[in-house]
């Protein structure tokens, strides 16, 4: 009888331990933790503004309801933070990105990028475009987008940029080169805020911003005050191969529409193919979210679920509309990974041409 009692008691203890372990396993990964959202540009830019809106809602949607704080790490055209999250940040699931661009550095084999972005566990991407605007007093005077062809001296139309292999710099150079507009690229600015200040002080005459900055910063401070006018926004490249305008930017021509207005036909050639290559990624992951390589599967899964909820969340959408002036369009992490593989592996002709073009830009006496 004692033997039977001991056996039953032992089974009860084992069962209790098993049940307790299950309870522990069921505890949400992020319960009681703090997450740092790393932003690769300075405060005030589109990446910063969009990241802070997400950070306000992520704790509510992420299982375990952790604290989420934002940390800006600008530098090297966004590269400092990109290298940091893959090289230095602990793979414990507690550092998540809200990066702007970055993938072009790998597409073009920039040695400053020391990591392989395809090894990152991608969480989500946010698609979008950029709007290029210019000072109205650019010689001989700009009243409408087509007036940019009136510029006769490249140094009268200086365009601010960050890094020659960065998305912003490449797209602007390619576009104005394709359009046949005289221009003078000025690279090396440390972030959007300093670039805008340079434009306000007439050190440069043109710059490009995302919609996150356009609606809430540029329109009230530069467009409505008659300092600048919008020149174009980048086309949306659709899955069927067509291009279209972004519906929330009425009255601002796309690159293809502006080209057609001037030349009477759609753009073609290697510049256009390179713009398509870059903007196809930008249209799905102008902002991109990842964790450090080697992060726990539980963290990756929980974060992906949270971003999936975020994309449909009414409170987030309302906040985004109020804070950014538009509602971001999300794509899932699997789509981001596929796009990266496509860009890196299936476009060798465009990639090689653009690498050669960048070498020409470096040698050109502007």
Segments (PLM) and residue ranges:
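An extracytoplasmic/periplasmic, membrane-proximal ligand-sensing/linker region
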Residues: 31-32, 224-230, 240, 250, ...
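Early extracytoplasmic/lumenal segment of secretory-pathway proteins
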Residues: 66-83
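Extracytoplasmic "Venus flytrap"
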Residues: 37-52, 74-77, 160-167
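Short, low-complexity disordered leader/linker segments with a strong preference
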Residues: 1-32, 360-366
């Amino acid at each position: 009888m004692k033997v039977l009692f001991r056996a039953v008691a032992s089974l009860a203890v084992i069962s209790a331990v098993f049940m307790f372990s299950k309870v522990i396993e069921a505890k949400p990964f992020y319960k009681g933790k703090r997450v740092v959202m790393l932003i690769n540009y300075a405060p005030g830019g589109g990446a910063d503004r969009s990241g802070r809106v997400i950070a306000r809602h992520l704790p509510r949607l992420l299982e375990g309801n952790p604290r989420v704080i934002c940390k800006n790490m600008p530098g090297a055209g966004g590269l400092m933070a990109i290298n940091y999250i893959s090289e230095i940040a602990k793979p414990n699931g507690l550092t998540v990105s809200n990066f702007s661009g970055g993938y072009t550095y790998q597409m073009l084999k920039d040695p400053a990028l020391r990591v392989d972005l395809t090894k990152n566990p991608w969480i989500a991407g946010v698609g979008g475009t950029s709007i290029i605007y210019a000072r109205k007093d650019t010689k001989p005077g700009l009243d409408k987008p087509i007036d940019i062809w009136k510029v006769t001296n490249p140094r009268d139309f200086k365009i601010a940029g960050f890094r020659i292999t960065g998305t912003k710099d490449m797209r602007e150079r390619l576009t104005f080169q394709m359009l046949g507009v005289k221009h003078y690229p000025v690279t090396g600015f440390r972030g959007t805020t300093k670039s805008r200040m340079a434009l306000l002080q007439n050190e440069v005459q043109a710059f490009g911003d995302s919609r996150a900055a356009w609606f809430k910063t540029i329109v009230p401070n530069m467009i409505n005050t008659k300092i600048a006018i919008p020149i174009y926004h980048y086309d949306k490249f659709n899955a069927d191969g067509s291009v279209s305008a972004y519906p929330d930017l009425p009255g601002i021509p796309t690159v293809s529409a502006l080209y057609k207005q001037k030349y009477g036909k759609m753009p073609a050639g290697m510049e256009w193919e390179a713009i398509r290559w870059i903007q196809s990624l930008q249209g799905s992951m102008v902002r991109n979210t990842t964790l450090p390589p080697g992060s726990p599967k539980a963290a990756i899964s929980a974060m992906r679920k949270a971003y999936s909820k975020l994309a449909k969340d009414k409170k987030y959408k309302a906040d985004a509309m109020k804070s950014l002036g538009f509602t971001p369009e999300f794509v899932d992490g699997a789509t981001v990974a596929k796009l990266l593989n496509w860009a890196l592996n299936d476009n060798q002709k465009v990639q090689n041409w653009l690498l050669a073009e960048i070498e020409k830009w470096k040698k050109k006496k502007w």
